[in-house]
Amino acid sequence: MAPAATAAAPRLLRAAMLLLLLVAAGRRAAGAPVVNELRCQCLQTLQGIHLKNIQSVKVTTPGPHCDQTEVIASLKTGQEVCLNPTAPMVKKIIDKMLNKASAN
């Protein structure tokens, strides 16, 4: 090899290793959860809905993703709606659904 080629080899190797590390770091970051996915699901809530339309209810307690309690009702039509957890009608719906689940 020529002296110039021998001197350039370590630089080329260093550049290739750096590129490999950057690609590996980029792929790892692509699989990490995005911060904006960790947010409240309910932007608007309903004060209530008729119990006969509800198939199931999911209550999400406050946590790092959202600082408020969320009540999400799955309707028999397949639609999901957010309910106001402090509304009296919603509290009754949750109680009835819990009693129904404990009876089964």
From Swiss-Prot:
Q: Which GO terms describe its molecular function?
A: chemokine activity; growth factor activity
Q: Which PROSITE patterns match?
A: SMALL_CYTOKINES_CXC
Keywords annotated in UniProt: Cytokine, Disulfide bond, Growth factor, Inflammatory response, Secreted, Signal
Superkingdom per UniProt? Eukaryota
Question: Which interval of the chain is the signal sequence?
Answer: 1-30
Biological processes annotated in GO: immune response; inflammatory response
Q: Which residues form a coiled coil?
A: none
The record lists its disulfide bonds as 40-66, 42-82
Q: Where in the cell is it found?
A: Secreted
One GO location term (cellular component): extracellular space
Q: Which Pfam families match?
A: IL8
Q: Which family does it belong to?
A: Belongs to the intercrine alpha (chemokine CxC) family.
Q: What is this protein called?
A: Growth-regulated protein homolog beta
